[in-house]
Amino acid sequence: MQNYLDLLKKVLEEGEETKDRTGVGTRRIFGPQLRFKFEGNKIPIITTKRVFMKGVIIELLWFLQGSTNIKFLLENNVHIWDEWADDMGELGPVYGKQWRAWETKEGNKIDQISNIVNTLRNNPASRRIILNAWNVGEIDQMHLPPCHMMCQFSVNSKGGIITHLYQRSADLFLGVPFNISSYAILTRLLAMHSGLHASELIMTFGDAHIYNNHIEQVKLQLSREPLEQTTELFIDNRPNIFSHVYEDFKLEGYKYYPTIKAEVAV
């Protein structure tokens, strides 16, 4: 995971100081990219601090449910969306709604995930295998517009899925470690349910930033030598991609340094 640490270091040392929506301020660069290869059951995961993998998996299952209410997250003691929910736990038409029930002008609903699985199975050479959460007609109704907003899936000649994610806004210290593992697991799930295998995860960032109140935490993380990537993720099979539960995911060999706490910029 040295490439992630190199990006942190670059933004810390070369990033321009910028005021932002939250009022905290950032150091940022625009347009960097990270690439991660899959090897067997290994998944890309940060070792220089602990990544809350239960939260990663529960959030992904929540997306796949098509939910926009934090009730499922709270039931599983995952509180990463609390700050943006209203008194009823609603977030507006965020990721789950767009992934599973994108509304057309005729009032029909499009299940992008089902379409992606079907296309991977039946037309893997397609250049139109795209997952999009940036619904411009509903952005104003979302309590937080999508940061990881769109990805394209491609299948290579060996039956390997390559996921290319575009993330318009990348909180490098808190958010991106989560996003890396989340889209790695999504790639594994899509591969499982389409008879393929996971090959590569590419992440292209728009505004890649470190919040000013994360600077000391980033320096601490950069002082740590990355541990060997030995983490394997085993996933029990299910009839379809939507029927998975948390207990299906078994993480083995994850070695990490202690947690580094930081405040989320809201």
Swiss-Prot record:
Keywords recorded for this protein, A-Z: Cytoplasm, Methyltransferase, Nucleotide biosynthesis, Transferase
Chain residues that bind dUMP: R21, R127, R128, R168, S169, A170, D171, N179, H209, I210, Y211
Active-site residues, as the UniProt record annotates them: C147
The keyword Signal belongs to this UniProt entry's keyword annotation: no
Biological process (GO), any one: dTTP biosynthetic process
Compartment(s) of residence: Cytoplasm
Catalytic activity as recorded in UniProt: dUMP + (6R)-5,10-methylene-5,6,7,8-tetrahydrofolate = 7,8-dihydrofolate + dTMP
SS bond partners: none
UniProt xrefs under InterPro entries: Thymidate_synth/dCMP_Mease (IPR045097), Thymidate_synth/dCMP_Mease_dom (IPR023451), Thymidate_synth/dCMP_Mease_sf (IPR036926), Thymidylate_synthase (IPR000398), Thymidylate_synthase_AS (IPR020940)
Entry GO terms, CC: cytosol
GO MF annotations in UniProt: thymidylate synthase activity
EC assignment: 2.1.1.45
Biological pathway: Pyrimidine metabolism; dTTP biosynthesis
Binding positions for (6R)-5,10-methylene-5,6,7,8-tetrahydrofolate per the UniProt entry: D171, A265
Enzyme class: transferase
HAMAP family, per database record: Thymidy_synth_bact
Similarity comment text for this entry: Belongs to the thymidylate synthase family. Bacterial-type ThyA subfamily.
Subunit structure: Homodimer.
Role description: Catalyzes the reductive methylation of 2'-deoxyuridine-5'-monophosphate (dUMP) to 2'-deoxythymidine-5'-monophosphate (dTMP) while utilizing 5,10-methylenetetrahydrofolate (mTHF) as the methyl donor and reductant in the reaction, yielding dihydrofolate (DHF) as a by-product. This enzymatic reaction provides an intracellular de novo source of dTMP, an essential precursor for DNA biosynthesis.
Protein name: Thymidylate synthase
